[in-house]
UniProtKB/Swiss-Prot annotation:
EC identifiers of the protein: 6.1.1.5
Any one GO molecular function term: isoleucine-tRNA ligase activity
Organism the protein comes from: Methanosarcina acetivorans (strain ATCC 35395 / DSM 2834 / JCM 12185 / C2A)
Top-level taxonomy: Archaea, Methanobacteriati, Methanobacteriota, Stenosarchaea group, Methanomicrobia
GO biological process terms, semicolon-separated: isoleucyl-tRNA aminoacylation
Protein name as annotated: Isoleucine--tRNA ligase
Oligomeric form and interacting partners: Monomer.
Gene encoding the protein: ileS
Short sequence motif 'HIGH' region: positions: 48-58
Keyword match Metal-binding: yes
Amino acid sequence: MIKEITAKYNAEQIEKKVTQFWEDSDAYRKTRERRKTGKRLFFVDGPPYTTGHIHLGTAWNKIIKDTILRYYSMNNRYILERPGWDMHGLPIEVRVEGVLGFKSKKDIESFGVENFIEKCKEFAITQKQAMTEQFQRLGVWMQWPEPYMTLKDDYIEAAWWTLKQAHEKDLLEVGKRSVNWCPRCETAIADSEVEYSERTDPSIYVKFKVKGEENTFIVIWTTTPWTIPANVAVAVHPAYEYSKFRAIRQDGSEEILIAATELIKNVLKQGRYADFKVLETMLGEELTKLEYESPVGDLVPIQNEIKHGVYLADFVTVENTGCVHIAPGHGMDDFNLGVKHKLPILCPVGSNGAYTEEAGEYAGKNVREANPIVIEDLKARNRLLAEGTVTHRYGHCWRCKTPIIYLATEQWFLKITEIKEKMLEEIDAVDWYPDWAGSARFRTWVEGARDWCISRQRYWGIPLPVWKCKKCGKLEVIGTKAELLEKAGLSGDIELHRPYVDRVTVPCECGGEKKRVEDVFDVWFDSAVASWATLKFPQTHDQFDEWWPADFVTEGHDQTRGWFYSQLGASMVGFGRAPYKSVLMHGFTLDAGGKKMSKSLGNVVSPLDIIDRLGADTLRAYVLSSSAPWEDLKYNLEEVETVHRSINILWNVFRFPLPYMALDNFDPMQVSLDSVKDALREEDRWILSRAQSVIKAVNEAMSGYLLHKAVREILEFALEDLSRWYIQLIRPRTWTEADDPDKLAAYCVLYEVYVTITKLISPFMPYLAEEMYQNLIRNVDPNAPESVHMCDWPKVNDTYLDPELEVAMDTVRSIVEAASNARQKAGRKLRWPVSRIIVSPESEAAAKAVNRLGSVLMDQTNSKAIVLTGVGKSWDELGLEVIPDPGKIGPVFKKDAGRVIPALQKVEGFTLKKAFAETGEFELTLADGTTVPVTSGMANFKETLPEGTASAESDAGLVYVDANLTPELEAEGYAREVIRRLQDMRKELDLVVDENIRVSVRIEAEKVLALVETLKDLIAEEVRADVFDLGSSIEVSGTLVKDWDVEGTAMKMGIAKK
């Protein structure tokens, strides 16, 4: 049977209880099994790194996923979703290095690669378990015992298989290119891994001496002085106009400079020149005949072996000088230009960011520390035209935050540029939420994509499955562990991590030995193969053939350049199509001011702290309802607490009828809604219709992943329609006899609505939904599904839908609100009845609503009658005040205006208005008995209220409240005041609903006592008083005795259990 619940919502208690129930009943597995005959839905979880505690962003991400999957499950989708864990790469290595106190790769090598690998493995697995428990506390349902983990050999094989596909399709390439490089981690990093932030760097203008021309210099600008020792060329734009001009200093000294004509003034300003004279102009293409000298040739001997020339490039812009310093070893554009013109790819910098021997005098110096040294050397050689600083957005390593540099190194690449057009076609075939996430944001990123550098010079990652012969140089790409063991002639098993796999060699046809290249995969390649790796492909094709590609994925908007992109690239290589059918892009979590959360700013919020204080359902409801999923979520504690209060109200909504239902032994299995249909009131039909409308609205919202709208619809329904309206309407019906059809109708309707709302909230607030389901449904129907999450999603019952009634009720609620405002103006509390409410409707629909729901209107306005005027008609008891217009009267009557105005004010308003309407004028009798004609423009009119009334506007029209008291109304008002206080005292004693009491009330004011005595029986009935002593001098006693001030009248009240 239905049982009472605790008075207060206790999230911690409920969540522990429900979690235990889920575990004991094996609810997750049974829920999935229950949907085996449904349409399949394959979801791929974007794997978080196992680096420690979850944060608000990862919590929001998992909550979105869980909510959508629960919704799909209830809509009979058979779901496959394994949680994923990214357990390789720099995110893990950097954390382990921190634990071990390592500063560089040398520390790792000294410690031993195998030891380091084992530490990384141990760290990743330990953190995975901790984070799993944290996600489970959010109420997230996934196959937690069977996650996909990127460190597992079967997962690694999926990456190997994909790379072999790339090799076989000629989409794998090895070569020297200038790539993003982290000097601390000593590895290449992908474009998508570069994080940009503000940084201040040197800004210098350098003069390159033109060979064969006296005192003539090409002027370049750079923010990386450290790259000057690697300079091999200057680039200019072929179509820009350049000038050779004489620049004159204050002391009369001069030199000839070359720069873009448009930028001469900037160059003069930077160099602090006093004057100039243009000697000649030419297009950029005419400068290619020039050669120049390195400004540091005496310090970097290799520079003297290079022929420095001027070359054309479209990437040159009209900024600074229009001449660009080219160092092919330290920039992608520079590198490409160098390759095009067969220039030396000079890269005198090592993996740790220090100059090599090729840098001559600079060898051994860190490039960042070398900037001021290079500047001083340029200054000493009169090659520095100007120096300053610039603050700009600069790339940093995504994990250790070190500023990146560009190095020309040998790397492995996927030829994304060769499949880019097909990738763009596939983007159009995917459903994107919102649409612009794919059509604009993602498309733009892919359009600008370069070949993907997939190799990393690190340790803890998926090893590149490339074996190279030391003798003949032949390459072999291995696709699986079985293939490797077979080709290596091994019979046992091996682990596919470094250094274990590094020890495996493969015989070469030339008689030599193939050894694995030392690089590991870019960690983004790990997660790129998730959609087939989680299906155990390529070891088995069964699940892959049944489920792939993914029906749905969702991640943050940074993944347009991350996981969405890497998945698409890898899938195009492996299968020639996108690995997902639909994608939801969500936003970032920020603080209330819109700033990114970071430990340094002290604005990080732990989702676990929120759960500990307010519960998981509160956190879920907050992040889901705060904004559209694709907008950034600005965390605001006050808003979280508001959501928590809403859930408390929802709890109270559920709690309200339970004591009465339990007391009456109400059994919804015995009394159906259909059996009491003849006893349904209009308000019952209305709430049933509203419930259907909410189902429709939530379905519509969920179809477009508008999770915020879905949650808001449900909470608004619970708070506004149920708590603040319907429950207030039916409250008196719950106090009648147990078998009263009117009461049973209210119970049945409430039960029907509660069953609906319990199911509606279940994807969003799974703990609260389960708690209520077990009490309301499972306790009365043992044949019901074991868990709310096994239930079918509510279907719209068209027989309950009545849109016209919903509109009518909205109209009535607007009138009630206006009546409340008018009461305040009249100084009459709602507890005190009024004789009548007058409504002047503006439309036939409003009048019809009042007629249809008159009883509701009377009840909620606490009035004895509802008076309805004609549509668009004024209330016939209104007065009409005449307001003379001196501006119109004065010019006509001049000195007599002082006699006309007071006489006009005394005319009965309706008479004057009628005369004006019929003839346009009125014969006005003055004080001396003479008459004068006044015209319609000389007076305005203002309606006046009868004494004791007040008015307010509503959506339906004007509403008037007659607040005049009669003795009967006054008696009822005082009676209601007494009842309220006695009920408060019952609550204070925590009495059960049906517990009878003894009451004594002393009222010394004889007039008030006489009024209250007329309704003594009503008071006794309302407060369940078997004994009720009332008088002006009686002794007041009881378990609880209190003094009260009731509308200025002193009363003493006492109550006691019978």
